[in-house]
Amino acid sequence: MSPLLLTLLVISLVGTLTAFLLNTFIILGTGRSFFSGAKTNRVNLIHLLIGFTNILMQCVMTTDNISFCFPEFYDSIYRIVTFPIMSFTRFSYWLMAWLCACYCTNITRFNHRIFIFIKKVISNFLPHLLLLSGIASLGLSLVHFYHVMSYSWKDSVEGAFNTSEMSQPDKFFTFPQILFISVDFNFSFIIIVTSLVVTVSSLLTHIWNMNKADSDIKQNIQVHVNAARTMMLLLLLSLAFYISSIFNVTVRYNLENLTSVVCWVLLTMFPTAEGAILIQASPKLRNMLLTWLSDGRLVGCGK
């Protein structure tokens, strides 16, 4: 086993354990209200879906990484896990987009008609938007999977007659195909960037105004600073995820290509990073995790 492959395997296993822990806490912290009959908000619904999606996505990605250790089974495993990886990756990015949109509509206070309309749409039709996002993720992943499998089959047939064909370039698609396959990533990225930029601008403006106010108001400034930091972390994470995803859906994964390896590692660590950001942003989830780490008890998940 090569040092690079061993490193990828260790990163994948550590990331899986960490992602499972963090996202399980997200599910426990937000899911109790769904089963207790209490009223839930839009952000909690998205958090719950993010927790489940991240765990499933991390599992299939780790399975794909482990398959590199068994070359004789890699092709079969690759065909099994490729479609789930595509679907979970797309849906996870849509969930982040709608989460950022909810943060924007909850935090900012604009009176423009367009903003009010968007806020009403998200408030009233969020479950429908999530369902539509899931269907779109499955549909585009199916098209993507078909093209990848067709390319792999053609490559294997040509390679059987001409071994020099096995070293073909890594690119899968033409530019129009890339635009179609990545359309959901592009829309999600636009929603995320727009929402976070508007939210951060609003928070920074509010913090600036609070700094010039009385000392009693300044005591609450840390809450807004923490919120702004969370938005910036989500923006950085979404940018890294977007670049890695676009590269991953358009270029064949190759252990000899450093860019390909880095992008795949970023995708593999996404569930862990997103779970960590969401937990540090929620005092309830953060205290719940710290309590469990200190004495091994899960408390506060029903509060």
Question: What positions do the PLM features span?
Answer:
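Structural signature of the GPCR N-terminal helical module
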Residues: 11-73, 95-105, 229-240
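Membrane-interface helix-loop-helix junctions at boundaries between adjacent transmembrane segments
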Residues: 78-88, 100-130
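Fourth transmembrane helix
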Residues: 91-95, 121-154, 191
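Extracellular-loop-to-transmembrane junctions of the mid-late helices
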Residues: 15, 139-146, 165-195
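Seventh transmembrane helix
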Residues: 94-95, 233-239, 247-256, 261-303
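Alpha-helical transmembrane segments of multi-pass membrane proteins
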Residues: 16-20, 46-60, 86, 129-141, ...
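Intracellular signaling interfaces of 7-transmembrane GPCRs
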Residues: 33-43, 108-125, 197-224, 283-303
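Class A (rhodopsin-like) GPCR signature focused on the TM5-ICL3 interface and adjacent 7TM helical core
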Residues: 97-98, 148, 182-213
